[in-house]
Curated annotation (Swiss-Prot):
Function, as annotated: Processive actin-based motor that can move in large steps approximating the 36-nm pseudo-repeat of the actin filament. Can hydrolyze ATP in the presence of actin, which is essential for its function as a motor protein. Involved in melanosome transport. Also mediates the transport of vesicles to the plasma membrane. May also be required for some polarization process involved in dendrite formation.
Stretches assigned to the IQ domain: 766-788, 789-813, 814-836, 837-861, 862-884, 885-914
Keywords, alphabetical: Acetylation, Actin-binding, ATP-binding, Calmodulin-binding, Coiled coil, Motor protein, Myosin, Nucleotide-binding, Phosphoprotein, Protein transport, Repeat, Transport
Chain intervals with Basic and acidic residues compositional bias: 1136-1147
Full protein name: Unconventional myosin-Va
InterPro entries per the UniProt record, alphabetical: Dilute_dom, IQ_motif_EF-hand-BS, Kinesin_motor_dom_sf, Myo5a_CBD, Myosin_head_motor_dom-like, Myosin_N, MYSc_Myo5, P-loop_NTPase
Gene transcribed to yield this protein: Myo5a
Subunit structure: May be a homodimer, which associates with multiple calmodulin or myosin light chains. Interacts with RIPL2, the interaction is required for its role in dendrite formation. Interacts with MLPH. Interacts with SYTL4. Interacts with MYRIP. Interacts with RAB10; mediates the transport to the plasma membrane of SLC2A4/GLUT4 storage vesicles. Interacts with FMR1; this interaction occurs in association with polyribosome.
Amino acid sequence: MAASELYTKFARVWIPDPEEVWKSAELLKDYKPGDKVLLLHLEEGKDLEYRLDPKTSELPHLRNPDILVGENDLTALSYLHEPAVLHNLRVRFIDSKLIYTYCGIVLVAINPYEQLPIYGEDIINAYSGQNMGDMDPHIFAVAEEAYKQMARDERNQSIIVSGESGAGKTVSAKYAMRYFATVSGSASEANVEEKVLASNPIMESIGNAKTTRNDNSSRFGKYIEIGFDKRYRIIGANMRTYLLEKSRVVFQAEEERNYHIFYQLCASAKLPEFKMLRLGNADSFHYTKQGGSPMIEGVDDAKEMAHTRQACTLLGISESYQMGIFRILAGILHLGNVGFASRDSDSCTIPPKHEPLIIFCDLMGVDYEEMCHWLCHRKLATATETYIKPISKLQATNARDALAKHIYAKLFNWIVGHVNQALHSAVKQHSFIGVLDIYGFETFEINSFEQFCINYANEKLQQQFNMHVFKLEQEEYMKEQIPWTLIDFYDNQPCINLIESKLGILDLLDEECKMPKGTDDTWAQKLYNTHLNKCALFEKPRMSNKAFIIKHFADKVEYQCEGFLEKNKDTVFEEQIKVLKSSKFKMLPELFQDDEKAISPTSATSSGRTPLTRVPVKPTKGRPGQTAKEHKKTVGLQFRNSLHLLMETLNATTPHYVRCIKPNDFKFPFTFDEKRAVQQLRACGVLETIRISAAGFPSRWTYQEFFSRYRVLMKQKDVLGDRKQTCQNVLEKLILDKDKYQFGKTKIFFRAGQVAYLEKLRADKLRAACIRIQKTIRGWLLRKRYLCMQRAAITVQRYVRGYQARCYAKFLRRTKAATTIQKYWRMYVVRRKYKIRRAATIVLQSYLRGYLARNRYRKILREHKAVIIQKRVRGWLARTHYKRTMKAIIYLQCCFRRMMAKRELKKLKIEARSVERYKKLHIGMENKIMQLQRKVDEQNKDYKCLMEKLTNLEGVYNSETEKLRNDVERLQLSEEEAKVATGRVLSLQEEIAKLRKDLEQTRSEKKSIEERADKYKQETEQLVSNLKEENTLLKQEKETLNHLMVEQAKEMTETMERKLVEETKQLELDLNDERLRYQNLLNEFSRLEERYDDLKEEMTLMLNVPKPGHKRTDSTHSSNESEYTFSSEFAETEDIAPRTEEPTEKKVPLDMSLFLKLQKRVTELGQEKQLMQDELDRKEEQVLRSKAKGGERPQIRGAELGYESLKRQELESENKKLKNELNELRKALSEKSAPEVNAPGAPAYRVLMEQLTAVSEELDVRKEEVLILRSQLVSQKEAIQPKDDKNTMTDSTILLEDVQKMKDKGEIAQAYIGLKETNRLLESQLQSQKRSHENEAEALRGEIQSLKEENNRQQQLLAQNLQLPPEARIEASLQHEITRLTNENLDLMEQLEKQDKTVRKLKKQLKVFAKKIGELEVGQMENISPGQIIDEPIRPVNIPRKGKDFQGMLEYKREDEQKLVKNLILELKPRGVAVNLISGLPAYILFMCVRHADYLDDDQKVRSLLTSTINSIKKVLKKRGDDFETVSFWLSNTCRFLHCLKQYSGEEGFMKHNTSRQNEHCLTNFDLAEYRQVLSDLAIQIYQQLVRVLENILQPMIVSGMLEHETIQGVSGVKPTGLRKRTSSIADEGTYTLDSILRQLNSFHSVMCQHGMDPELIKQVVKQMFYIVGAITLNNLLLRKDMCSWSKGMQIRYNVSQLEEWLRDKNLMNSGAKETLEPLIQAAQLLQVKKKTDDDAEAICSMCNALTTAQIVKVLNLYTPVNEFEERVSVSFIRTIQVRLRDRKDSPQLLMDAKHIFPVTFPFNPSSLALETIQIPASLGLGFIARV
C-alpha cells in the first residue's frame, strides 16, 4: 500500500518543534495526495494547520502504536526515525526509570545522576549465562555477550564505551570490568580481579577531574585489555592511555578543578607522613585555585586519598614509591607558586630565597641556583656556538607551566607502566576482552587542538562502527537467503582522509612545526590554500582567518587555529630537564629515562649566566650536528600512530558498543532534555544505526509468531497445514507491494512501517468484531431488560392498587376511632386541670397561713427575750458599780493605815535608841519572859486546836459549798426548763389549733391523694411491666455479654496462642539464622580448602615437583589432624612408650599424635622441673638464713649448697637440651611441605622416633633424680638443727666419718634404696591425700558458691515478693518453689541416669571380662590336655558353629584398612548398591567395624578408621562431585552413619526406640560425640554440594519451562516486536518445558528414595529445589519486560499449580516448598489484577506481602500490555503504591538471592535393622573382613 494511505483520521504523527524538538499530534481528517495542509490536533488541546513543504511534499513522521512504546530495542519499532527513537528513550527513562536501551547492536546508556540498585552481585548472577536478547538491556548483558562469544568463537572481544563528558562512560566501563572479575575469577594465587578493579581509583585520581559537565570526568582515553587463560579466568590486564589533558595541570576554567590527586594531597596534608611535603589548603596553590571550586559536594578527598593509597598498595607500589609520587606531585604544586619579576621587556628574575622554589628544589633534590637560572634563561645553539638568552616574564611563566605539565605527564606514564607491571601475569594469555573508555564527539564554542584529536578519533571509531553494523545486516540477509541490495550508509572516509592523508591537516601541522618561523596563522593559510574549495568537507568561516570548519559525521565543528602548533610541539626546555635528571631523588630521573635527546632546538649546555653570551663549542665525537637535527615526534603524530594501533586491535576483535547519553547539563536525576539528547544521539551514531536498519528490513518475524499474531486476519479456508505457505498466501493478499517484505528460511522480513500497517489492519478487524459483538450483546441485554421491566411494572401496579384500597379502609376506621377518643380525652384533660388547680390553691392557703402565724410567734418571742436581756444587763451594771466603789473604799483605808503604821514605827525607832528605855524594859523582864513562855505554850496548844477545827470547818464548808453550787445549777436548769416548757405549752396550743386546721385540709386532700394513688398504682404497674421488659433485655444483654466474654476469652486464648506461635517462629528463625551462619562458614571453609588444593596443585606444577603416588599432602594431613583427631577419655598417657615401638609403617596422623603427646610430656617435665627448682630455692633460702645464724658450719653447708647448685645446673642444662631437641624436631617437621617428609624413613620421622626414645629414657632418669634430691632435702632438714656451739665441729666431723664408713661398707647404697622406696611410698600417699583434700575443698567451695547463689536468689525473690500484693506474692512464691523442686528433680534424674550408665557400662565390662576369663580357662584346659604334642605344628582349621550368635560387629586387620576404604568408598558404584542391596549398607558396615575397634578398646584403630572414612568420602565427592546420584548416595550414607553413632552411643536420649538387643550393641569404651559433630559438618557440606548440583541441572530448564514455554496454548498473544534478537551466546540445546522440570524433579526424588535418604532430609531438598525454581523465575521476570503481561501471569500461575500438584502427589505439601513459591505466585497475581484505582492499590499492598517494595514497583514499571486494548500502568498509580508501601520495612534488594541455601538439619532417625542380621555381599569385595 502507499505510505499516504496511512495518514487517515486519528493517525498520530510527529512534527518539529523548536522547544521539544518533536511534538506529537493527531490528524483531524484523512490526508489526500495533493493536500498542502494537514489539520492536526496537538496533545495540549490546540488545533494546528501544518503546512507541507511545497518542494518535497514530505509528510510528517508517523508515530508508532502505543503497544510498541517502551521497547527494549529501538530497532523493534515499526517506524524507525529520530522522533520515535527520542520518544522511546524518554518513556523508558522518565516513566519506567530504565536507563539502558538496545539500538541494534548498540547499548544506549542514559546517566540517571542517581545511585540505582541494579549493579549488585545478585544482578550479576542473574545475567550470568543468559542470552543478550532474553534479558532487559544492561551493561552486564553486553559484558556477558562479550565473555560468551570469547569462549564460544575463540576470538578476542572489545567493548567500546563512548559519550560526552559526564555521560557515564567511566562508570559503565568500571561495571563491565567488575562483571568480568565476578563471573570469571582469577587463575593465579593472587586476586587479579581485585587488582584490575583497584586500578580504577588510581587512574581516577590522576586522570579524572571536575568539569562543568561532570564531577568525575576522565581527561584521558584508555583501553584496558583483560587477559584470560584457557579456562577463561582472569590472569592479568594491560592498559593503554590516549591524549592526557596536560593543560589542566596548569590551568582550570571557572567552576572546574585540577586532577583529583592534588586536592586529595591537600586534604591529607596534616598526616604525619605528609609533613615533609609542606602542603596546605588547595586555595594556597596557583595550580588548584584557578577554578574557584576546590570542593565537590558529597566527596571527601581525604577518604579518597586513603582509597588511592590502599589501591597502590594492592597493586604492589611500595610505600617508598608512593611517597615518591606524592613528593613529585607536591613539587608540581609548589612549582606553580614560583613567581617571576620583570627586569625589562626581554628578561625576568626570581626573587632571592624564593620559598616556593626552595621547597620545589628540596622535594625534587635539585640545585636551587641551577633551577633558578634555567627558569629565567634558555639556550640557543648554532653549528659552532651556543647562546644563553634571558627570557621574558611571559615566556618564563609558559616555560614553568610546560615543565609542570611535562613532569606530570611523565609521572602519569610511569604510574600507568607500574600498574601494567602489577597486572601482568606470567601465565600465557589465551584471549582478552578490551574495554575502551574513549571521549565522545565534542563541540564547544571554542574548539582547539584537544577537540580536533577527539573528533578525529571518533571519526575513526564511527567508520569502524558503520562497517560492523552494515556487515551484520548483510550477514543476516545472507543467512536467511533473501534477495538484498547494497544498503547505502554514510562513509566518513573522506573526512578521515582530510585529516590524516598526505597534505592533510595533521601532515600540514607537522610540517609547520618543523619550520623555524612557523606560526598558527601561516598554518591556517596553508590549510586554506590546500583544501578550501577543493574538499567539500572543509570550509572557512566568513569572519575569521584563524579558524576552519570540518563537516564531521555528527555535525559541523569550527576549530580555532590558535595554540595548535604549540600543543602539537609540546615544547619544554632541555636545560630544565637536565637539571631534574641530575636530581639526588632517585625516582625523578626514572621518569625521564625514555626522553629523546632533542627536546628543544638546542642541546648544548653552558654554565654561563650572562644575559647574552656567545660560547665556542667543540665538536662532539659523534656525528656533527646530530642533536640539532633530531626532533621528537609531535603530539598529533603520536596520537595518529596510537589510534592506528587501536583500530588494528579493534578490527582484530569482535566489537560491542555502549553509547552513553547525558540527559541534561544540570545533573538533575531522571530529567530528560530532548535537545541535548538529540545532539548526542546524532553524534554517537545511534541514529546512523537506525538509518541503516530502516534502509533494509528492520522488522523480522518467525512464521509461527506471525501466524499466532495475525491469525485474526485469515479466513478458515486460508489456513493450511503448512504455516509458511499460509503466511505467504495471507501476506500476498494483505500487502500488494512485494518489495515491502521478503520470505526467509525461518523469518519474514518487513520494511519499515509494514508491521504498523499490519497492526492497523489487525486492530481494525478486532475493532469491527468488537463493535458487532457489542451491538448484538447490547440489543439482547436491552430487550431482556425491557421484558423484565414490563413484568415488574405489572406486578408493582397490582400490589400498589391493593395496598391503596387497604390503606383507605384503614383510614376510615381510624378517623372514627380518633373522634371518640378525642371526646373522652378532652373531658379527662379539663377535669384533671380543675382538680390540680383546686388542690394547688388549698396548699397555697395552708402554707401562707402557717407562714403568717410563724412570723407573729417569732416577733413575740423576740420581745420576751429582749426584756430578759435588759434585766440581766442592768443587774450586771449595778453590781459592777458597787464592786468598783468598794474597791476604792478599801484602798483608802489601806493607805490611811499604812500612814499610821509608819508613824508608829518611827516613834518606836526613836525610843529604841535611848538606854533608859532599855533599862526600864529590862526591869522585871525575866518574870515576864516566864509568863510569856507559858502563854506561848498555851497559845500554841490553842493554835493547834484551832487549826484542827479550821481544817474540819473548811472541809464542811467545801462540801456545803459544793452542794449549794449543785443546787444552784439544778435550780438554774429547772428554771430554764420551766421557761422552755412554758414556751412549749404556748407553741403546742398554737400547733393544736394549727393541726385542727390541717386535719380539715388533710381530709379534703385525702380524696385527691387517693385519686393520685390510683393513678400512681397504674403508673407503677406500668413501670413494673417496663422494668420486667428491661430486666428481660438486661438478661439478654447479660447473656450476650457472657457470650462476648467467652468469645473474648477464646479470642485472647487464640491471641496468646498466636503470639506463642509467632514467638516460636521467631525463635525458629533465629535458630535457622544461626544454622545458616554456621553452614555458610562450613561452606566457606570447604571453598577455601578447595582453593588451597588448587593453588597447591598449581604451585606443584610450576615448581615441577614430582608428585608421589598415593601419598597424602601436608595440607591434607594438617587439616585432617586439626579437624578429626581427638584424644579419647579412655586413653592413658602411659601408652606412649609402647606406641613408640610400633612398626614404622604407621600413618602420618599417628606420628603427629605421638608428636603432640611428646610435646605434652616435655611440658609436664618442664613443670615438674620448675616445681623442683622452686623447692630448691626455698631450701637454699633456709640454708642461707641458718648460715647467718651459725657461722661455725661453713664447710659442711658450703659442700651441701655446692652439691645442690650442681644438681640444679644439671637439671637446667638438661631442660635446655630438651628444648633444643624439641625445636630441632619442629624445624625438621616444618622445613619441607612435600608428602614424603612425614613418611617412615624420612629425616623428620627418624628425628621424631629418636627424640621419643630419648625422652622416655630421660623420663626415668629424672624420676630417680627427683627422689634423690628429695631424700637429700630430708637429710638436710635433720642436719640443720640448733645445736650447741661447742659440739658443732665435733658433730660435723663425726657425721663425715660416719658417711665415709658407710661408703666403705656399701651400706649407703642399701640405705639409699630403702630411703628411695620409702619416699616413693610416702610421696604417693601424700599426693593422693593432697588430691583428695583438693577435691573435697573444691567440692565444698562449689557447694558454698551454690549456696551463696541460692541465698542471693532467695533474697532477690524476697525483695521482689515484698513489692507484690499478697495474692501475687503467694503465687510468685509457689512458682519459685515449683521451679526449685523441678530443678532439683532434674538434677536427681541426671544423677540417676549417670549412675545407670555407669552400672550398664560396668555390667558390659563384667560380661566381656567373664567371657575372656572363660576363653582363657578353655585355652588353659586345652593346653594341659593329655596327648598334646608341643613340637609338632598343627594347621589351624576353621570349624563353623551351628547357629552362631553374631554380635553385630565386623573384624578387620589394621593393614586392611586402606583396602576396606578403597572397596567400600572410593571404588563403590552407587547405582548397583542402591538397586540391589539394602539402603545405607556402607554406613552399617563402617559402623560395625567401628564397633569392633571399640570392643577391642583400640583408640588408634577407631581414630584411623574414622579419619580415613571422612577423607575418602571427601575425595569421592571431589572427584565425582557433579554427579547427583553420587552426592545423594553419600549424603544418605553419611547421615545413616551419623544416626548409627547416635543410636548406639549409649546416651539415654538416643536409646528410646532401641530394642533390648540393640541396646546391647552400644559402644562401651569410647565416646564419639566429637566425631559426630565432624560427621554432621561433613553432611552439611555434602548437602550444600547436592544443592549446587541440582541447581546446575535445573537452572537451564527454569526460565524456558516456567516463563518462555506456553503451557496453555493460545493465551499469550505475541507482541509486535521487531524480533531483533542478538546472536545467541549459548548453543541451542532444545526448548525445555514444564514437563522437563517435572521429569527432572521426579528423577531427583526417585534417586533420593532409592538411596534411603531420610524423609525429613528429602523434604528439605525439595524445599530448596522449589526455592531455586521460584527465585530464578522471579528474578528473570523482574529483568524481562516482555514477560510482564496479563497472559504471562496466567501462564506462571498455571505452572505453579502444576508444581503444587507434584507436591501433593509426592505427599510433600508439608515440606515448606509451597511457601517458597509465594513471591512468584504474588508476582503472577500482580500481573493479573486491576491496576487503576486507589482500591486496587490497597488490594495490591495487602496481597503482595511476600514481595518487597522494589519488586512490586519494578513489576508495575515493566508491565506491558500484549495488545492495544489494554492500558499501561499509570505513573500516578505507581506513585500511590510507593506512598502506601513507604512504611513497610523490607529489604531494598530487587532480586531474590538464588544462591541462598536454607540451613539444613538432620533429625535423629533410628534404624530398626538389627546389626547381627546384616550380610556382606560378595560383590563388594570385602572378603577380608569377618562377622563377629
